[in-house]
Amino acid sequence: MYYCNESFSPDEMCIFTTCTASLDVCIFMRDRTGIHVQLEEGHQAEADDLFDIVLQDQGLPAECEDVFALWLVSPLLELRLKKKHKPFFMVQQWDELCSKYTDAKAEEIHDDEPVLMFQRNVFFPKEQEVNITYEQVLRILYHEAKYNVLEGRYILNSDEYHTLAGIQALLSMDKYNSRNHIIETYRASLHQYYPEHVYRKPTGFFARRKSQGPKDAIEERWLNAHRQISQEYENEDIDSKRGELYRRYLEYLWPYPFYGAAFFDSFINKPQGKLGFLKRSHNIETWTAINTNGVCLIDREKDEVLLAVPYTELCWEYGEPQFDVDDDSFPCVFLQFLVNERTPDGVERRVTKVLQVYSRQAKMMIALIESCVERKKLLRRGIPAIDDVDGMTGQNEFHARCINKLGKMCLTTFTTSGMNNNQ
């Protein structure tokens, strides 16, 4: 067994390589390094066996059993493995799983190949994560969080992108030095420190009119963030402060309701407004983010959080696809939640909103929601769950960083007595 420090390209990311009497297995980390191990009878290896190999190789404490899990991850699908799952056989069924749980074309499925990834356990509660002090654990959590930021899954306040880029620069580029760190250095590396939607140039007539700002605004703000945090650690050895910096990065993300979530491909219907005839598509492509505290919906085109609802305010139900000869129907998840709404007369009333979220992965979404809620119920009754989950997060904390954008979704409204207000 050896630890691979080099980065891997997508073509090199192969989980299993068969040998005459054994199986070569590669387990990847979110920092693009991997652990390569040769196993006798590797075809029969369970996720729990491979998990222990990672703990040993990385020098992680046994308590990490709750913090991390093994996943099969590809551009099309992400699956958390249970302890008794056998990854080799899961990979053999990958085309079938992608056909069932994604809307990908046959050639996309044929070209898709999963990697075995060691990453955060979706059932590990954020309330327990904030107490972690072990540097190696924080490092792994940091790299996964950074991945989610750069992939555009974690939608943040604009100023925080620069702060996080400054922390990342201090960790990877060392302290700011005016001789070495010039504006061109930052401009050439934007894609490694920011999600695309932050630095990409808008297109179209309306976009050009909105983007009348200094061209170097992002580079300059990143440079300033790097310089500022470097000044804070001016007299410190950065290598001795890495654990503190990993934690500092994570602290900016913990308040967001989607932190630590599993992300599912989905879409919702657009509301039909006065200019509805101009819209080319009636759907909004979304991420549905589900964690131990609630459900979030993220607009993937506009990179904004549309909805964040804690389980304390949520009801849900699976909807079978309504097959139509001329329509490729999708299963869906019905999300029902309470909101305060003002009538045209200015009177505030309590109503129920229902949103349909369409996804090939709807059954997986429902299963994850119900598993998270069931674990919380067991804990409240004093019964330890298989994956330990802390108590409910308060609804105010869940909403702290996000404002629900109800007007941007196609919602059905009911009164508390059950009357449909859309009719």
Model-derived features: positions:
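N-terminal recruitment modules of adaptor/scaffold proteins
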Residues: 2-14, 19-34, 147, 153-156, ...
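Classical protein tyrosine phosphatase
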Residues: 46-71
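Eukaryotic mixed-charge, acidic/polar low-complexity intrinsically disordered regions
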Residues: 2, 60-64, 74-113
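Short, conserved secondary-structure transition motifs
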Residues: 71-79, 169-174
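Acidic, Ser/Thr-rich intrinsically disordered and amphipathic helical segments
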Residues: 46-53, 137-144, 313, 364, ...
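Elongated alpha-helical scaffolds
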Residues: 110-126, 136-144
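C2 and C2-like phospholipid-binding beta-sandwich domains
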Residues: 89, 99, 103, 117-119, ...
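Short, contiguous acidic and Ser/Thr-rich linear segments
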Residues: 29-52, 309-310
